[in-house]
Structure formats: C-alpha cells, structure tokens
A protein has these predicted regions:
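Short acidic, Gly/Ser-rich segments with clustered Asp/Glu that frequently serve as metal-coordination loops
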Residues: 85, 177-185, 288-293
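PP2C/PPM family metal-dependent serine/threonine protein phosphatase catalytic domain
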Residues: 141-158, 207-215, 240-273, 277, ...
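Bergerat-fold GHKL ATPase/HATPase_c domain
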Residues: 1-45, 145-164, 336
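C-terminal catalytic subdomain
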Residues: 1-2, 10-13, 208-213, 218, ...
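Conserved ATP-binding N-box helix of the HATPase_c
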Residues: 37-64, 209
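Catalytic core of PPM/PP2C metal-dependent serine/threonine phosphatase domains
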Residues: 183-251, 269
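N-terminal entry segment of metal-dependent catalytic domains or homologous docking segments
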Residues: 133-178, 183, 187-193, 265-267, ...
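Conserved beta-strand-loop-beta-strand hairpin that lines the nucleotide-binding pocket
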Residues: 1-8, 51-140, 164-173, 204, ...
Length: 336
C-alpha cells in the first residue's frame, strides 16, 4: 500500500462562529470519504467538541484535519492544537466536564466516539488527537503522524512526503524542492513519482531514478528511510538538509546525510544502516522545522501517538518562513 503526500488542513478557532464551520468542514470531509450519515455524525460531534474546548480553555487555537488513506476504508484525523496552559486530563475525561469549566460532553465521550484518542498537555499547550473510521470497516490504525504546511497557506507546497508499506516493511520519502511555490512543488512531485514506482528498491539505484526524474527542475533535498520489520533494521539515505532522527525512550540519534542537490549535483549517495530499531520512533523533517528540538524535553511525549508528536513539533519549532513537513513513524507498528 502506498500513501501519497498531502497537506494538513488548518482551521483557525478564534471565535464561536468558527465552531460551526469546523463541524461542517469535518462532516463534509467524512462524507466525501465514504462515511455514512451515522459515522459522519460522529466526526461532526468530535470536531464540535474539540473546537469548543479549544475556545473555552485556550481562547484560541486550531483544528488540523487530515484524510487517512487505508486499504479497507479511509479515516479522518482531527487534531486540536493550542498554546495555552495545560489542564487536568483526568478530570476532563469525565462525561459532562469541559476543559473550560462549562458544560460539555467531556473528552471521555469524545474518546468513545473515536477509534483512536490521545493527548499531550503541559504548560506549553495541548494537542488532542481523534482518529475516526467507519465503524463497519474495522480498519486498523497506522502508527504514523504527518504535519505538513505550506508557506502562507499557499495551495502549492514544495515539500512532499510518501509512504509505502509491504507487510512488516516500510519505505518513507521526504523531498524539499528548492524554494517554495509551484516550481518547488513540481520538482518534489517529479521525485515522488519516481519513488512510488519502486519504493523498496536499493536506495542507491532508487536515488539515481529520482535524480533523473528531477533533472530539469529546481531540484531539492531528499531523504529515504527503509525499515525492515523482520530484521529490525533501518537504512537511511539522505542528500541535502532533510533531518532524520531515531528516538527511543531514553536517547536519540541523528541520521546522517550527504551534501548536494537531487536533480542538480551531489557527490555520492551512501546509505547508512541502523540495527535494533524496533520500538524506536523515526522522525523525518524538512528545514521548515528548526533542528534544535529535543523530544525528551517533553516528559511522556515519546509514548504518545506519532500524530500528536508531529503536531507538537510543528507547533513549537516551525520556522514560519518556508514549507514544513514533519513525519513520525512508530517503527514496530509499520504495517500496511
């Protein structure tokens, strides 16, 4: 199964009129992706409560929406993101308790409506995750997280990500086309198309194919990570400034790349192999994200859902002057 890259849809929540807009937007997204009236109603309910809680306890924030492509059915991801002081999660899981101290259905009820529910909250803010799938589909959740945003919400994004699954194996791609806008997107999409044809090929040969596909475009930076779930190994190949990290509960290590421009010039493409990575998080990110973050500065975050981790990193470390992509994969669960 292949999953092609797409942007995160962002809805500002700054006044009560935007709650209804969030509900309608989420419900339509669900209906357009095969949810029946009952399941789409669950999506609408969750979007309403999450947007309401953002407004009540934080004053302002965002909902991030994403389609979750699946082999049996698509899902809908809703993330509520804010920068307010954290709240008492245990109290908020009680039915009828709102994070704003007013009457609400409670996050406990939200968690029952969603197939996947997770949260990270501290003094820097809160990220709440709800993933919903059609109840009849019994779709399995993929332990991956994506946060991708274009500069100034431009429809064109020079960053591209792509994931391929083959049983217990995974191959992940991130490309950052030089600059931003339509020409950067054209360069990155050309590389993505070549990658999608043979995502599990030898990375040296795969990179050559991508380089040829991107020749004549602006070119860009690239990283490919290939995970073997049976052996518990990761092979990482990078050209340019796509960041990569392997993170466990108590340590992290950066993944090495070579200088150059794919579609332009680079000297070599040596893959680097990493053993015993089952149970680790793989994080790949474009240079729209600052590199000075440390996941262990956020107690407990390493144990949260990858989608929560991606949203926290984007919230706190986005540079704000380029397209940005954050891809997080829990490697032990990389199954299609």
């Amino acid at each position: 199964m292949n999953i092609g890259g797409s942007l995160t849809q962002v809805l500002l929540i700054e006044d009560s009129s935007q709650i209804g807009h969030a509900r309608r937007t989420a419900q339509k997204l669900a209906e357009d992706n095969g949810f029946d009236a009952t399941d789409a109603g669950r999506v609408a309910l969750v979007a309403t409560e999450l947007a309401s809680n953002v407004l009540k306890h934080a004053g302002r924030g965002e909902l991030h929406l994403r389609i979750l492509p699946g082999s049996s059915a698509n899902g809908i991801e809703i993330l509520a993101v804010d920068r307010a002081q954290g709240f008492d999660l245990q109290a908020c899981m009680t039915d009828g308790f709102s994070t704003g101290g007013t009457q609400g259905i409670g996050l406990g009820a939200v968690s029952r409506q969603a197939e996947v529910f997770d949260v990270h909250t501290d003094s820097r803010g809160t990220v709440l995750l709800a993933r919903l799938y059609p109840r009849a589909s019994k779709a399995a959740d993929l332990r991956i997280g994506i946060s991708q945003h274009s500069l100034h919400n431009d429809p064109a994004c020079g960053d591209v990500w792509h994931l391929a699954f083959d049983g217990a194996n995974l191959s992940a791609l991130v490309i950052d086309g030089l600059g931003h806008g339509e020409e950067a997107e054209r360069a990155a999409r050309a590389g993505e198309k070549a990658f999608a044809l043979a995502p599990f090929a030898s990375p040296v040969y795969l990179l050559e194919d991508i380089h040829q596909a991107m020749t004549g475009t602006r070119g860009g930076a690239l990283a490919i990570a290939q995970f073997d779930g049976h052996l518990g190994t990761l092979r990482f190949t990078g050209i340019g400034n796509i960041g990569g990290s392997l993170i466990s509960a108590d340590k992290s290590r950066g993944l090495a790349s070579h200088p150059g421009i794919v579609g332009g010039q680079y000297r070599k493409a040596q893959p680097f192999d990493y053993a015993h990575v089952n149970g680790h998080l793989l994080i790949m990110y474009s240079d729209g994200l600052q590199s000075r973050w440390n996941l262990h500065d956020y107690p407990g975050l390493v144990y949260r859902h990858p989608a929560v981790i991606a949203a926290v990193l984007h919230r706190d470390f986005c540079r704000g002057r380029d397209d940005v992509t954050v891809l997080v994969v829990a490697l032990e669960a990389a199954h299609g």
